């Protein structure tokens, strides 16, 4: 935990005994309904868990209590927060990255149990049942067809995994069918090293499109709803293994940003509101495995928070809009 404004570090948890690998992805979510944000995360070779925030008086003073989310899901690469069943409470979407372990080649959404402090496991609902092969990476969640129910998309990187290199989403069937398997819709195949995908009305036509990156390959693109025609945003950036979408310049349309860990460039893509992007290089000596949009300094504009990869750092980029 890094506490603003001086970013003093507090260690809130050390890796579980026997847990292998690194914590690749995480979310903040109020699990226990006490009004503060808890933390949900994963070890790349183990099961998802959450850390109970002890409250504002002691959150920065030591360890948080760890509790399990699921005892079978293994090799998690992404965890997202969103209300999937429209009950007014956030759920978590988690993929099973390991094809031969846990619920291999599947993606689930998990609802918070009635008593999360004592539950052995959350309520798991497998919507992508064995049809998320190929090294599924990062999910995006949005209502693509305007029916009030959120779809879930993912990119699959391919090698060394079989049957990858695609972007797809799963159609949320809504109501009583939301807890079962959903229909998979392929957006595009032959997308070498596909990873990140997020919803955004890119061209301002009122339809929600998908914005995506080939995080183990080259390029950032967007898919136009409803034909899913591919439009290039950046054809040169290498390994854009992070993606964030927001109105960074506050002009009423959605922009995007990424960092290519091979290119070592942090890029901001300025949208003109019609799906045409101007490319801005914010840094040319930085790597990334994840990039988030946050108002880091509380000045009312959106900054960028970057978790470095080979650069082994955590940095943020101040939006000059409100300077």
What residue ranges belong to the model's regions?
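Beta-propeller-forming repeat regions
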Residues: 1-323
